[in-house]
Amino acid sequence: MNSFNEGAVSPLLSIWRHSLWLSGVLLLSACGSHSELPPFTASGYVGDQGAVRIWRKDSSDDVHLLSVFSPWRKGDTTTSEYRWQGDSLSLIELNTYSQPPEHVRIRFDDRGELSFMQREVDGQKQQLSSDQIALYRYRADQIRQTSDALRQGRVILRQGRWHANNTVTTCEGETLKPDLESWAINHIERRQSHSSVEVSVAWLEAPEGSQLLLVANEDFCHWQPTAKTF
């Protein structure tokens, strides 16, 4: 899932940091948004080491969240799945697509007490320390808070296949023309010129504007969650 290269990371990060794009979203969410939010949402943000995409489904008091981290250069793609019942975290499941791959699964009971834990690396099962579990819980809290802010701030993730006329066929089958800056379009076109297939793009839309998130040869739509399957 590595996407940005050839120096494309720096302009993206500088633009986001200069405009305080995510900070603006956090401030907007802090002010509160009382209009009804859809139960299934997709969002994301730019991190220091890579892009994060978040899918979330809210049903009654339950929250199901999937976070996908894609590194800019070095590092491994990681998926993190979480479930909450009310405010209580009930599941953490992590997959790191490294060599060898790593899988972590942690469950908590209705009282928030640990009920199951396991780490598996290259087929070898291991136990987790209390410090490791505490770190995973902390990360779960952080991604939940970030997701809350992005959701309230109306930051929407869109993905699809890029076409030569600067339009995208999204994973939902819509044809859109993202309102991206010229440097972002130039970057996509450079990537496309080195690919024999139409590249996939992911971008974010919000009241503050649109930002390119990822470009890759991989078909993002092949594995993207949907409201029915998530």
What label would you give each PLM region?
Residues 27-30:
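C-terminal motif of bacterial Sec signal peptides marking the signal peptidase cleavage site
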Residues 32-34:
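Bacterial signal peptide processing site
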